[in-house]
From Swiss-Prot:
This is Putative potassium channel protein YugO. It comes from Bacillus subtilis (strain 168). Pfam families: Ion_trans_2 (PF07885), TrkA_N (PF02254). Disulfide bonds: none annotated. One of its GO terms (molecular function) is potassium channel activity.
Amino acid sequence: MKSNRIFISWLRWPLFIRIGVIILCLILLFGQIIYILEPKQFTSVFEGIWWAVVTVSTVGYGDYVPHTPLGQAAGILLILSGASFVTAYFATLSAAAFSRQHRYIEGKVAYKGRDHIILIGWNEKTNRLLKDLQLAAPSKTVVLIDESLTEGPLIENVHFIRGHAADDGTLKRANITEAESVMITADQYKSETDADMLSVLTLLSVKGLNPLAYCIVEILTDRFVTNAERAGANQIIGTSEFISRAMLQHYQVKLRPSKQQNGIKLTLDQHVELLAVPDELKGAAYKTCVLYFLDHNTTIIGIQKKEGPMLSPPLTYKVLETDQFLAI
């Protein structure tokens, strides 16, 4: 029974370690044997071990050569037995390296770093965001979580994890407990309602594992904004509201053409500007401020407070004198 347990324990070792142990035993054994068979040619056990290493690796320097039939027979036996194990050893290492690389591309390798950004969902917005993050923080590692991709994008400083973002196992493989920030994008393959439900569920899973993570979540419908706030979102991006304002701005530009506007192409890439609160808007509701600036061909996307930016605040929010408008 004891020998059986030892054999089972031996089989549990990784294959390349077992082969390496066998090769080491062969080298030590034949180094001792050749020293005993030809003491004149091999004056020490170390010289025998050196000869065994050179022989088993099929290098064959020729500095030590057995002269007796017994020594030559030992050399033949070592080549036949040892060379096969050495070949199997390096083949196993190569296969293990290839397998790990393949598992890395498929998103099956866990991330071990810390202070990273977790980006959930793969779409054109995410692709653009990754490029912008590389420009803004080139040394920051981004862990991409997505279930639809079979292979991760080969982008520098991007570690791909394949799996459902709301699953604890997937988040743990992304090392969520050590993450600095989490960005959750809406699932493009679901309806708006289902996508928002999944985003809130993912947010709950993230906050449950790392309450200190700074979470930015994309919400498509207004009715899920409150749920996202309750789930602990630090910032909520209302895509529908942002797009509607931008389209309205484009429409107003069309209605009010001017010589300076001819030939100008407006995009969503405009730089965000900070605007002071006009005297007539101090204490006014955020909705009133939005309409005021729309009349002046300016789109407001949020409020810059002393504590930090607040994107898409409630329409009933009262603007303070110390606030600033985030405008594009």
